[in-house]
Amino acid sequence: MASLSGPISPTNLEMFKPGVEELNPSKLLLLSNHQQGMLYPTILGSLELLSFKRERSLNLQRDKVCLLHQESQLLKLRGTGTDTTDVPLKQPMATSVNCCHDGIFTILEQDRMPKTSMAPTLTESSGSLVTRLMSIPRLTFSIGTQVAMRLFRLGFRLARYSLRVTILKAQEGLHLIPDLLHAHPVEPLVQDRAVEPILAIEPLPLV
């Protein structure tokens, strides 16, 4: 204690100096990185910071290339009537016959398109209709004629009017049968059948 009460020498002052630790430059860099919010470690003298920057720039360049590719696809499809508001459409699967190299479908030639002829169908339907009309039994006409004559004698106006219209239509159909036969001939299998001839019916009084 006596030594402490004496005069203070410079060596004693050096002993009482607070110990200040010199900071390493690498620790300073780590501290600055932590303050800036960087999550990757950086050591002085390493190339991690440069590699990170290089990788980030490559990712940005890759994104730019993808954006340019999408824009080129949109510009390519703009003149073909395709909706370009959304992401570019994928080229549909198609054969080389009706699809060009740029994915645009073309209409097939008219010669290659299948053609279906309706002529045989019309001939068969009309021939069967004519055959059916010609093969109506004579008994049906006789019964209808008798019913019509009775109604005319009774004098019902509504019944006479309806029967008169029916008879006129039937006579018109009988007159049109020869024209239908010339326009649409009956099939050979139908012609071999024995068709009962239609007898001439006396004109009924329409009054």
Curated annotation (Swiss-Prot):
Keywords: Virion. InterPro entries: Corona_nucI, N2-like_embe-CoV. Pfam families: Corona_I (PF03187). It comes from the Viruses. Its main location: virion. GO terms for cellular component: virion component. The keyword Hydrolase does not apply. It is found in: Virion. Belongs to the coronavirus I protein family. Structural protein that is not essential for the viral replication either in tissue culture or in its natural host. The gene encoding this protein is included within the N gene (alternative ORF). This is Protein I.
